[in-house]
Amino acid sequence: MAINALMLSSSRVGNTPYLEHAIEFIKPLSQNTKKWLFIPYAGVSVSHDAYLSMVQQGLADLSLEITSIHQSEDPKQAIRDADGIFVGGGNTFQLLNMLYQHDVLALIREQVQAGKPYVGWSAGSNITGLSIRTTNDMPIVEPPSFNALNLLPFQLNPHYSNYQAPGHNGETRAQRLLEFTVVDPLTPVIAIQEGTALWRQGDSLRLVGNKEGYLFHGKQQEVPLAAGSDLSSYL
């Protein structure tokens, strides 16, 4: 497979402007790919037009032509015509549900497996794994299935942080991911912190950014993955 896919943990790091930190990660995928299609379906409290404008402004330094799938009367043809695909963050359940509604999930997978560059952040990264069972989001809608793009043969958990506020008695993120590994001990979960990403190029997978990631797999819990690690063995 000639997959060239970038899975960003988040659209921001700290108080930095929208997508600013991601430009250096996206640049290698965009040098020969100028016509991009944005998929804004994860946005719930923002209009598709406003979301598109945010992305266009955030990535203006890359001088790309970015249109949105919602502007096309034929979403499938819009995907075929694009040189690359951006999928934004928001609610992962809403995103996956709309991809199923428009019957484009399989087409996106096919196009990316054939070499079309893919960049997702947050929810747009969540859907690149086997399923969305390790998303952080509230299930505000019910997709026909939790099965996702399967561009990566494991589960993702973006925005990873195991911080627990003093006096707060809810589960930590690590505890929630432990629950997943109890019911599905054979499927790995790779958790990535804000400011980092996974970059798959064919049979190569690397953790990019300056923070470590974490592996949850069966009895292996919150195992650190060094920044810059080669994670190709998980493909």
UniProtKB/Swiss-Prot annotation:
InterPro entries: Class_I_gatase-like, Peptidase_S51, Peptidase_S51_dipeptidase-E. Its main location: cytoplasm. Coiled coil: none annotated. It catalyses: Dipeptidase E catalyzes the hydrolysis of dipeptides Asp-|-Xaa. It does not act on peptides with N-terminal Glu, Asn or Gln, nor does it cleave isoaspartyl peptides. GO terms for biological process: proteolysis. GO terms for molecular function: dipeptidase activity; serine-type peptidase activity. One of its GO terms (cellular component) is cytoplasm. Keywords: Cytoplasm, Dipeptidase, Hydrolase, Protease, Serine protease. It is found in: Cytoplasm. Its EC number is 3.4.13.21. It comes from the Bacteria. The active site is at 122 (charge relay system), 137 (charge relay system), 159 (charge relay system). SUPFAM superfamilies: Class I glutamine amidotransferase-like. Hydrolyzes dipeptides containing N-terminal aspartate residues. May play a role in allowing the cell to use peptide aspartate to spare carbon otherwise required for the synthesis of the aspartate family of amino acids. Belongs to the peptidase S51 family. HAMAP family: Peptidase_E. This is Peptidase E. The gene is pepE.
